Amino acid sequence: MLQNEKYKGDALLQKTYTVDFLTKKRIDNDGQVNQYYIENNHEPILDREKWEIVQLEIARRKKFREQHKLQFYIMQKENNPFTTKVFCAECGSAFGRKNWTTSRGKRKVWQCNNRYRIKGQIGCLNNHIDEEMLEKAFMKAVGQLQKHRSDVVAKWQKLEQGTNLLYKHYSKQMYQILDLDKFDGVIMNQVLDHISISEVGQIVVTFLEGTEVFL
């Protein structure tokens, strides 16, 4: 819906055309007749810059899905904020959440989806990680940015002065983590691109505006 140009006040004329004037049958115009694009045709529902950001974000998510071989891009900000956010540095597969029952109670752990893709066979050898450790890793990365506040703020200000609307938007989102002192899944989803985990335990946290933190 938000991909429709009407939301930013523009109009694309002759999306369809009449093929039978007696029955008034119309079909989609796939280049058979000329189309006309009119800017500022009417009062926009969404301002032009926000509309453009939405289109860029849709394209980014599509590219993200293709790069990480995901069927869907899912954002469960509160109940499961790490969905489609954690990836294996060894095989590239996404990590999935598992609920383990132990003598100490239930544990939420994440492991590579290629670990047991074929029943009874061990695939990827990467280790699992507790969800609590993922939260701590994100907060540790945030702490690194807070520690180098002046440097990252200078980077964000430079991005805000640039022409890339999406990076300008991401940079503005990043300021909210400068005073973050506890994990918040909603905020994390607004600033995090992904987390990668290697077999030797190295964690790389990549933020949407391009900053990488190696832990």
Predicted regions and their residues:
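Conserved catalytic breakage-reunion loop centered on the nucleophilic residue
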Residues: 1-136, 142-170, 183, 191-215
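Short, hydrophobic/π-rich interface segment
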Residues: 173-177
